[in-house]
Design a protein with these regions (language model features):
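Conserved glycine-rich Rossmann-like NAD(P)H-binding loop of the short-chain dehydrogenase/reductase
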Residues: 33-47
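C-terminal helical subdomain
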Residues: 174, 198-250
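Catalytic Tyr-X3-Lys loop
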Residues: 95-114, 132, 156
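Active-site helix of classical SDR
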Residues: 117, 152
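Active-site loop-to-helix junction immediately N-terminal to the catalytic Tyr of the SDR YXXXK motif
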Residues: 97, 142-150, 162
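Conserved glycine-rich cofactor-binding loop
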Residues: 10, 17-18
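Conserved mid-core segment of classical short-chain dehydrogenase/reductases
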Residues: 86-103, 145
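Residue(s) in the substrate-gating loop at a strand-loop-helix junction
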Residues: 136
Length: 250
């Protein structure tokens, strides 16, 4: 991939201060994009800024706020919008959740994607723009220790597909695609849950992680997304994302 393949393009990444978001911001910057990174943690964003330099613009804000979604969409008109922000669910079986903890990811992850996807359609973003949402492989397999997380991530996948349909109906030319990353200890959320599921199965964490197969890293997530937006464009609404790359879902 050329270092300047995305030269002149603006990318906006939510949850850009750590984990997948940071890896995605780094990959897009390396491909030549001007990256706007949104997160609530100013210090984390400043670390990314120090690493990436002037190609990265930090914006300290709550990505779940609908006003923030509207203001930043209007201000930056991104050609690439990556919706990665989300909350870490509490690792406990359902009988130990309250409705407040069970629904945490509906109030954060789903609301965040809904607000930004809505703004992308209403603006609308320019034809040829791509909106990438981060769902989870838990949307396919469930996640009995994470409350409403799997359901929330399934909702994100469907929201993205609905947006793709609306873009096609209105001839907007905006691409919408959802990625479902596998569980990985390489992110803060993943590290919590590899430990939790290892304990639930009565095995050590290293053995549990080994059973997940080829590990997925934030760097690989960034490369996968950059490949999607620099190629001919996604030809499916959703892809499973593993350490081996992208696999289309039907």
């Amino acid at each position: 991939m050329s270092d300047n393949e995305l030269a002149g393009a603006t990318a906006l990444v939510t949850g850009a201060g750590r984990g997948f978001g940071r890896g995605i911001a780094t990959a897009l910057s390396s491909a030549g994009a001007q990256v706007v990174g949104v997160a609530r943690d100013r210090a984390a964003l400043e670390e990314v800024r120090a690493a990436l330099g002037e190609s990265f613009t930090p914006v300290t804000a709550d990505a779940t706020d609908p006003i923030v979604a509207g203001q930043l969409t209007d201000a930056y008109r991104p050609a690439i919008l990556v919706l990665n922000a989300g909350a870490t669910p509490l690792p406990r079986p359902i009988q130990h959740h309250t409705w407040q903890t069970f629904s945490r990811n509906w109030d954060s992850d789903v609301q965040h994607v809904f607000n930004w996807v809505r703004e992308a359609l209403l603006a609308p973003l320019a034809p040829g723009s791509t909106v990438v949402t981060l769902s989870s492989a838990a949307a396919l397999r469930g996640s009995p220790l994470s409350g409403g997380y799997a359901g929330a991530k399934a909702a994100i996948r469907w929201l993205t597909a609905y947006a793709a349909e609306e873009s096609a109906r209105d001839k907007l030319g905006i691409n919408f695609v959802s990625l479902l990353p596998q569980l990985t200890p390489a992110t803060a959320l993943g590290a919590v849950y590899t430990a939790a599921y290892a304990a639930r199965q009565g095995t050590d964490e290293a053995s549990y992680i080994g059973g997940l197969g080829l590990g997925l890293t934030p760097e690989q997530a960034g490369q996968a997304i950059t490949g999607l937006v620099t190629g001919p464009g996604p030809d499916h609404d959703a892809y499973l994302l593993t350490g081996a790359g992208l696999r289309p879902l039907t």
